[in-house]
Regions:
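Helix-loop junctions and terminal segments of transmembrane helices
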Residues: 27-28, 57-74, 256, 260-284, ...
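Signature of the first transmembrane helix
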Residues: 5-62, 91, 95, 99, ...
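Hydrophobic alpha-helical transmembrane segments
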Residues: 119, 148-197, 367-371, 385-407, ...
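Membrane-interface junctions at transmembrane-helix termini in multi-pass inner-membrane proteins
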Residues: 68-71, 127-150, 174, 336-367, ...
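Interhelical loop/hinge segments that connect adjacent transmembrane helices in multipass membrane
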Residues: 1-6, 145, 173, 177, ...
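Transmembrane alpha-helical segments of multi-pass transport proteins
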Residues: 368-371, 417-472
Length: 472
């Protein structure tokens, strides 16, 4: 692949999808006056259950897509057709299960509105198969435009419908939920042409039961890894809904969590951009470079979370034109530090991917996800919805303890970090950074500007002192 092609594809896969996030931020001042914490509560609970089943429904069968493309270049479409049918059937089953659970969970209960809402909210499960195949086929054939612009068009169309329903029709949570419904239906319909027709990938019923069992045996172990991410992000809302916590309180948590999640965007983009250097340094056993790259990503994560936290009140005043939703500002300030350990996850998981020891990934995601569920289940009945804030933070930060308790990561992290005691230093920096940022978020604007300049200067000084420019 030429350098120009690499840059072009990086732009399509990395920059273009972020346009939807930019548009959603611009829309906030226009839509939030017509939304309530109850709307965000309903939306948060519904999307949590839907995300849970979206992660389970593929049954890990996507593992066969890339492998068959390279192993059977002339007939890969036959394998993909079998996978497509199995995914369509499993998504139908899990979509119906999701609808049934939502009918018993959402406050609308067994009514026509409740049934319609559960169906609309479950469509991303029913119609997820085409999008999943498209996410694999277009990068493999190096044709990003069809994938990226279909998803972008669907997302923008969904956001337009959402805006109309919220701003003009005053339909609250219906507007929030309609966005996912419209974008999913649009993408599924377009990919029928781009995937089914253009690549001759059609649903194929496999009569060979032994082959189906063999495919599932390979695929199913991947489900817990995907499920772990959902448990980390959605456990709190699922547990709160089962404990009948007020939907207004669930909405406060959901909105604060959404705003806090923006803090990880910079770190994830940096880690994605540095992935070639991360891969190369580990494969070449250049652990000194690998360690410096980690320090760079972790420092950027700390500085970004600190800056977003201290400026969060101003961000809310600028974007959130709703007094009830503005109460979630302090939640956002805390949760923007939850995934500050994302860099550590990236650098711990990279060796496992390189060595194809993917079973070890369960420790990084599934175990913290289960921890989050258990903490929420235990603490929310006692301390209310605010317990979910700390259970989420603790569960993410628990990834720092893995090198002390799991043999594989004890050896791997010691190899590239040098000394595991540095993990405790990182934890101390995270805690002190969070305490300091939350203490300073209400100081005067001129003081925040000064603090921001100091933080950026420290980041620049660290970058120069460690001579990180030579690595990137």
């Amino acid at each position: 692949m030429s350098t120009r092609k690499i840059v072009t594809n990086t732009f399509y896969y990395g920059v273009v999808p972020k346009l939807t996030m930019l548009v959603s931020i611009v829309m906030l001042p226009l839509t939030t006056p017509f939304l309530s914490t109850f709307d965000y509560g309903v939306y948060g609970v519904l999307t949590s259950y839907t995300s849970l089943f979206v992660s389970i429904a593929p049954l890990g069968l996507n593992v066969h897509l890339t492998n068959s493309y390279f192993e059977m270049p002339r007939h890969y479409n036959l394998v993909w057709g079998r996978v497509l049918l199995m995914m369509l059937l499993s998504s139908l089953c899990f979509g119906l299960v999701n609808m049934l659970i939502l009918l018993f969970t959402l406050p609308m209960g067994f009514s026509w509105e409740g049934l319609a809402l559960c169906f609309v909210g479950s469509v991303p499960i029913f119609l997820m198969a085409n999008g999943l195949l498209a996410q694999h086929i277009f990068p493999l054939v190096e044709r990003p435009k069809h994938l990226v612009f279909t998803n972008l068009s669907g997302a923008l169309l969904g956001m337009l419908v959402s805006f109309v329903l919220i701003y003009w029709c005053r339909l609250g949570y219906w507007g929030l939920i309609a966005s996912g419904f419209v974008s999913t239906v649009f993408a599924f319909s377009v990919f029928v042409k781009f995937v089914w027709h253009d690549f001759d990938i059609r649903p194929i019923w496999d009569h060979n039961k032994r082959r189906v069992r063999r495919m599932l045996k390979i695929a199913l172990p991947l489900v817990p890894h995907t499920l772990g991410f959902v448990l980390l992000t959605s456990s709190a809302r699922i547990v709160m809904s089962q404990y009948h916590v007020s939907y207004d309180e669930i909405g406060l948590f959901s909105h604060g969590s959404t705003m806090g999640d923006y803090a990880v965007v910079v770190t994830s983009a940096l880690a994605l951009a540095l992935m070639p250097q991360i891969q190369r340094s580990f494969r070449n056993s250049d652990f000194r470079a690998y360690r410096k790259l980690y320090f760079l990503c972790q420092t950027v994560a700390l500085v970004t979370s600190f800056l977003i936290c201290i400026w969060m009140p101003e961000i809310y005043r600028l974007l959130i034109r709703n007094a009830s939703l503005a109460q979630s500002c302090d939640i956002a300030c805390l949760l923007c530090f939850a995934n500050v350990v994302y860099s550590f996850y990236v650098f711990m998981s990279a060796p496992a991917f390189i060595e194809k020891n993917t079973v070890q990934l369960l420790w990084l995601v599934f175990v913290p996800g289960i921890l989050n569920f258990v903490l929420c289940y235990t603490l929310i009945p006692v301390f209310g919805y605010r317990a979910a804030i700390w259970s989420t933070i603790i569960s993410y930060w628990s990834q720092l303890s893995i090198p002390f308790v799991v043999g594989y990561y004890r050896k791997s992290v010691t190899q590239w970090l040098g000394h595991r005691g540095l993990i405790l230093v990182v934890l101390l920096l995270i805690v002190s950074n969070q305490v300091l940022a939350n203490a300073l978020m209400h100081v005067a604007v001129w003081q925040k500007i000064l603090l921001s300049l100091v933080a950026l200067a420290l980041l620049g000084g660290f970058y120069w002192q460690q001579r990180l420019g030579s690595l990137v």
